[in-house]
Amino acid sequence: MVTIRLQRGGAKKRPFYQVVVADARFARDGRFIERVGFFNPLAAGQAEKVNLDLERIQHWVGQGASLSDRVAKLVKDASKAA
């Protein structure tokens, strides 16, 4: 099953997440099929907090991919703002 989920990066105590399309069997920070955005929970000032390619996300959902809970919330907020 294909899932759209967060992949953690960044440093210790400074998380940065890539939003990726990955097979559910792959490790959280392992292989992925496509990167469709990022989420920076510690963004300050003018830094961009969320950047999502909503068109590609809709494509993958149409192909049967499921969204993780956190990504579903990010997509909902991003589509509301757009």
From Swiss-Prot:
PANTHER family: 30S RIBOSOMAL PROTEIN S16, SMALL RIBOSOMAL SUBUNIT PROTEIN BS16M
Family designation: Belongs to the bacterial ribosomal protein bS16 family.
Official protein name in the record: Small ribosomal subunit protein bS16
Domain of life: Bacteria
UniProt keyword annotation of Lyase present: no
Keywords attached to this entry: Ribonucleoprotein, Ribosomal protein
GO terms classed as biological process: translation
Database matches in SUPFAM superfamilies: Ribosomal protein S16
GO molecular function: structural constituent of ribosome
One cellular-component annotation, GO: small ribosomal subunit
InterPro entries: Ribosomal_bS16, Ribosomal_bS16_dom_sf
